[in-house]
């Protein structure tokens, strides 16, 4: 049964009783979004710096928040961070709870001034996804270089070209490889287009209607590596198209990889013995 309301939660102050454990477990996302710990901390440091520049935080308060957040990040990196079940419902509350334990709640409590978790989670997701796409882009570029190099080195190799697994015409081995090279090059081009829409900053959008303190959104976006801003605050916090678009792009990439792998599996069989 639910007990008394938790004094450690960020919300529920008007509740007369504690939250049902089933609801607590259902509502927690910390075991998924803890993957965003670094992005969340970097976003919080950028936010605190912008608040300091507006005079909302003084130099000492900002220095303490930055120091504390970097200590929290080291705990995550070293595997020493301890999640509090029932309290740390997501990565944002976990990081801020631990920050308060390190530097004291009086200063830590000022970190979130003017910021909504709506924009915070959107920033974390976009930064994390951008970094994953950067990694995939690097792998794809290396892969394409190998395809191009092997195609040039092995240009004189000839093989049967197949339709429905029936021999049709003689082709160069490099022609087969470059058919996939073109598909992966198109995937690379599409990835870069997707990344342009991912890499837009919603920080400063507030819960839905912007920031009341005139915080410098451009400075925060530059610090966090965003290309531009999302200028409509409601769109900034509500949009998840960039996630769906990335998944759509990933589906096409995996389709091409599957076709390529299937050909290689067939060509490496005893019946074909090309590979």
Give the location of each predicted region.
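Acidic, glycine-rich loop-and-beta core segments that form the ion-binding/anion-interacting portion
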Residues: 224-275
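A helix-coil-helix interface module used to build multimeric assemblies
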Residues: 2-210, 215-222
């Amino acid at each position: 049964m639910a007990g008394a309301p938790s004094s450690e939660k960020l919300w529920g102050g008007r509740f007369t009783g504690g939250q049902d454990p089933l609801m607590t477990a259902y509502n927690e996302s910390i075991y998924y979004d803890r993957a965003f710990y670094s992005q969340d901390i970097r976003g919080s440091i950028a936010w605190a710096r912008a608040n300091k520049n507006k005079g909302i935080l003084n130099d000492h308060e900002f220095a303490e928040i930055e120091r504390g957040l970097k200590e929290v990040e080291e705990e995550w990196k070293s595997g020493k961070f301890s999640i509090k079940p029932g309290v740390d419902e997501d990565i944002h509350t976990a990081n801020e709870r631990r920050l308060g334990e390190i530097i004291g709640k009086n200063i830590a409590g000022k970190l979130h001034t003017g910021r909504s978790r709506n924009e915070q989670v959107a920033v974390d997701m976009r930064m994390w996804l951008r970094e994953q796409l950067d990694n995939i882009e690097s792998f794809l570029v290396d892969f394409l270089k190998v395809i191009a190099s092997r195609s040039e080195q092995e240009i004189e190799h000839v093989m049967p070209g197949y339709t429905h697994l029936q021999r049709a015409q003689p082709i160069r081995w490099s022609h087969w490889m470059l058919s996939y090279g073109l598909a992966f090059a198109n995937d690379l081009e599409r990835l870069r287009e997707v990344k342009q829409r991912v890499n837009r900053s919603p920080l400063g959008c507030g819960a839905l209607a912007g920031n009341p303190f005139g915080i410098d959104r451009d400075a925060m976006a530059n610090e966090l590596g965003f290309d531009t801003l999302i200028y409509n605050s409601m769109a900034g916090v509500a949009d998840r198209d960039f996630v769906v678009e990335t998944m759509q792009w990933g589906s096409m990439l995996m389709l091409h990889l599957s076709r390529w792998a299937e050909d290689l599996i067939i060509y490496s069989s005893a019946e074909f013995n090309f590979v």
